């Protein structure tokens, strides 16, 4: 059997029919699997000494979430070094990266494997891998025929990555036009919710707008901030991180703006704050809702005027910093409650983004599980870590109240448990290895953290919120007005007056 002109033309036509890069990639490997009659095919992108799956056919879905390092996968390292078609003999001692990852064949190892490195000029940009359970499956195809397939795939991948680069740079003046792969941000997911989020990140990354990133705890807001920074013109400069929730009030101002020698006890030398460290770069303020009102006012001034004052210094320093902020709170409610400044909220939320909870991301759970399985494999020195079909179903049926962070911990714990009950360096995760509560059902869809209030205006919304706060305080304190005032941190006389104005008492 050999490739005819019609077969090659058919592959080229399928590439042109695709709508978008992902569809073209999928059409390519699906067609190749049919033409070569193999059990599995995959298109991989090469970056930073690792291969990242872009499209698969005949492999377990979690492969799309895995990241295959050269150090951890000798066959892929051989493909990366070869520069030409690589055929692995059926008795090769090198483990196949897809062993145990062909559905229905989890306990069997791949027998035949061909690797095709993909190049753009002299740069390695990816690889095609072809696997079969029959040892002699690929012997009927010549190296020259496989090189033609590699050329078609390399052209499709090179064009896609170049377009991605140009889009991420927004055709910025000064762009060299030389092909440079986009950096991996570990934002794994193909669900509609994640696809939309990635599009919004691409839109805002090339601008210089401040961004407010909302979402539940554990959804990956820091990864969103990294993706925005990496896709921006500021990517050559630092991304500085500060967790506002971990800042004691006594040192918060110094952490943000720095201090001069002698500004306070213990200030034995001048010290730059996070804003100075992030000059010409990006500052990511995590848990922004935890900042005190006093610090919020000082942060607002920096956003308005672009200058800071170190603690203990009267001089102003100019800084050029893009601010990305994240919160798991509903800042609109915080504004109504008087705990967050409305003017700062509007300064930060020029372009709001919402990171969806894991329960709304469908099959992304399996992709992320694959990513964490591969991490565990490398960390523990195992030859393979795979999910059984039952384990995949179990993960998909769980509600994940702790989101991606909970999934990561669950995978790590399951690998340790499975390893303890099985000899050797191969781990197959079963449903029983996951200590997940059966009674935790998927939570209802979360409303956007920027959902508009149903009231007609700000005053009505504020009064309704105050009314509810007072009712709750009274209920929790047996309708004792003095105790309720203490709980609300207000004077009892002021509470009586406010309640009367709101119609809660005569």
Swiss-Prot record:
Protein name: Anaerobic nitric oxide reductase transcription regulator NorR
All residue ranges annotated as the Sigma-54 factor interaction domain in the record: 187-416
This protein's pathway: Nitrogen metabolism; nitric oxide reduction
UniProt keyword DNA-binding present: yes
Superkingdom, taxonomy of origin: Bacteria
Organism placement in taxonomy: Bacteria, Pseudomonadati, Pseudomonadota, Gammaproteobacteria, Enterobacterales
NCBIfam families: PRK05022.1 (NF003451)
Keyword Protease: no
Organism: Salmonella typhimurium (strain LT2 / SGSC1412 / ATCC 700720)
DNA-binding region: 481-500
An annotated GO BP: positive regulation of DNA-templated transcription
Residues with the 4-aspartylphosphate modification: 57
Function: Required for the expression of anaerobic nitric oxide (NO) reductase, acts as a transcriptional activator for at least the norVW operon. Activation also requires sigma-54.
Keywords: ATP-binding, DNA-binding, Nucleotide-binding, Phosphoprotein, Transcription, Transcription regulation
GO MF annotation: an example: cis-regulatory region sequence-specific DNA binding
Paired cysteines (S-S): none
GO terms for cellular component: protein-DNA complex
Binding residue positions for ATP: 215-222, 278-287
PANTHER family: ANAEROBIC NITRIC OXIDE REDUCTASE TRANSCRIPTION REGULATOR NORR (PTHR32071:SF35), TRANSCRIPTIONAL REGULATORY PROTEIN (PTHR32071)
């Amino acid at each position: 059997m050999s490739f005819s002109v019609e077969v090659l033309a058919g592959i080229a036509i399928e590439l042109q029919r695709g709508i978008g890069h992902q569809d073209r990639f999928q059409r390519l490997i699906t067609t190749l699997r049919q033409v070569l009659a193999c059990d599995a095919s995959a298109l991989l992108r090469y970056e930073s000494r690792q291969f990242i799956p872009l499209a698969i056919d005949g492999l377990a879905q979690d492969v799309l979430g895995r990241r295959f390092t050269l150090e951890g996968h000798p066959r892929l390292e051989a493909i990366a070094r070869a520069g030409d078609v690589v055929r692995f003999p059926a008795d090769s001692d090198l483990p196949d990266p897809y062993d145990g990852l062909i559905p229905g064949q989890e306990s069997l190892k791949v027998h035949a494997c061909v690797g095709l490195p993909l190049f753009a000029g002299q740069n390695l940009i990816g690889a095609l891998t072809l696997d079969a359970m029959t040892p002699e499956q690929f012997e009927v195809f010549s190296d020259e025929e496989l090189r033609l397939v590699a050329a078609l795939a390399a052209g499709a991948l090179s064009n896609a990555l170049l377009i991605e680069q140009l889009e991420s740079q927004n055709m910025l003046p000064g762009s060299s036009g030389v092909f440079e792969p986009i950096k991996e941000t570990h934002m794994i997911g193909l669900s509609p919710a994640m696809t939309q989020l990635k599009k919004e990140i691409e839109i805002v990354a090339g601008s210089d707008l401040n961004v407010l990133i909302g979402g539940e705890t554990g959804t990956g807001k820091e990864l969103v901030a990294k993706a925005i920074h990496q896709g921006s013109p500021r990517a050559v400069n630092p991304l500085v991180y500060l967790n506002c929730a971990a800042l004691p009030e006594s040192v918060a101002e110094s952490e943000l703006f720095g201090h001069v020698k002698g500004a306070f006890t213990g200030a034995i030398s001048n010290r730059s704050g996070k804003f100075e460290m992030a000059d010409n770069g990006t500052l990511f303020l995590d848990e922004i809702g935890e900042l005190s009102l006093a610090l919020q006012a000082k942060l607002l001034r920096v956003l308005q005027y672009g200058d800071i004052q170190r603690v203990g210094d009267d001089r102003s320093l100019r800084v050029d910093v893009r601010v990305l902020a994240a919160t798991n709170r509903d800042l609109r409610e915080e504004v109504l409650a008087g705990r967050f400044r409305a003017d700062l909220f509007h300064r930060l939320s020029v372009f709001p983004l919402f990171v969806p909870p894991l329960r709304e991301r469908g099959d992304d759970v399996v992709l992320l599980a694959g990513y964490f399985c591969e991490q565990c494999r490398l960390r523990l020195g195992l030859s393979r870590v795979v999910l059984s079909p039952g384990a995949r179903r179990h993960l998909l049926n769980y509600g994940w109240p702790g989101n991606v962070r909970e999934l990561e911990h669950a995978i790590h714990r399951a690998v340790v448990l499975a390893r303890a009950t099985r000899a050797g360096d191969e781990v197959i995760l079963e449903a029983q290895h996951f200590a997940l509560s059966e009674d935790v059902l998927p939570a209802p869809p979360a409303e956007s953290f920027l959902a508009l209030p149903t009231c007609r205006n700000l005053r009505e919304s504020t009064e309704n919120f105050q009314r509810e706060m007072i009712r709750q305080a009274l209920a929790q304190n047996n309708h004792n007005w003095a105790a309720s005032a203490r709980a609300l941190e207000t004077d009892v006389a002021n509470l009586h007056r406010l309640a009367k104005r709101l119609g809660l008492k005569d």
